[in-house]
Amino acid sequence: MTFAQKLKELRIRAGMSQEKLAERVGVSRQAITKWETDKGAPEMENLLALSDLFGVSVDELLGRESRRPTAGYLYESVTEYDVADPKRYDVKLGGARRLTIRGYEGEKLRVRLLSDTLSTLEADCKVRIDDSRGRLDVDLQRLNGLTEAAAREGLTIELDLPNRYINHVELAVNVNELTIGELAAEELEYDGKVQNVTVDGFEGALEIDSNQDMKVDCRRLTGSLAFNQVAAVSRLTLPQGFAFVARKRGLGNSLYFEEAGQRAEDFSDPDAQTVIELNGMKSELFICR
């Protein structure tokens, strides 16, 4: 891919017009047009500005293959997008082996794709971002015949969201492992297949819609955690001293309690602020500590 093609792709992915990009970089719209039609090339100063704006290396901008190793992974692709006001995030990521979603104090949405096996990761996985009023759509597209099975075997995703600009998050993805950390949102809805979940710092209403049997390790949570399942058996592990209200809704659902691997009496606290809730039908939730 040439620099002209890459620049146009990055601009469109970021939802910017040529005028907006020119304003951000500090050049004229005509300069952007020349760059995108391969009739001119930017100075290094402007290349660095573009690199910083889009969160890619200069080598990637110029169409050169990056050989830099990433700690723990052989292949990496990073997409960043500036967020300036509170948003509702609609995130569709398809399949992956592992997903970590975190909140942080910055002002960028960051999607980091990592793999040890997908050598053409940057070409085969593209993150599309659509920014409309009050809403940010993030869509991971698989290209060049990359299958869901290959992604679920070899792809790790790290999603960082700016806590100050989060209203609501809808997350659709199929993974083996999901980790949620240091995130604050009015509501986070997870929809998809998942086997192992770790919640290590979440504030708000968390809902997991999955019909798979799950193991959920909830270490730190303020707010509520709701399971919406059909014909599933899941286990929720809580730390000692974690106070919560347990609620059972839906049809034919059952709540059970365990301590040290043995069945126990209900140890929930009706006066607690945090709520654990089972919805759906014909499902069982074991709450353990």
Q: What kind of feature is each model-predicted range?
A:
Residues 5-24:
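Short basic helix-loop element that most often maps to the first helix and adjoining turn
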Residues 141, 200-289:
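Short, surface-exposed interaction patches in beta-rich subdomains
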Residues 45-60:
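DNA major-groove recognition helix of helix-turn-helix/homeodomain DNA-binding modules
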Residues 27-41, 64-66:
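Recognition helix of helix-turn-helix/homeodomain-like DNA-binding domains
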Residues 7, 21-22, 32-35, 61:
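Conserved hydrophobic/aromatic packing and binding residues within compact polymer-binding modules
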Residues 80-88, 98, 120-203, 264-289:
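Right-handed parallel beta-helix
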Residues 13, 64-109, 113-120, 149-153, ...:
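Short acidic/polar N-terminal linker immediately downstream of export determinants
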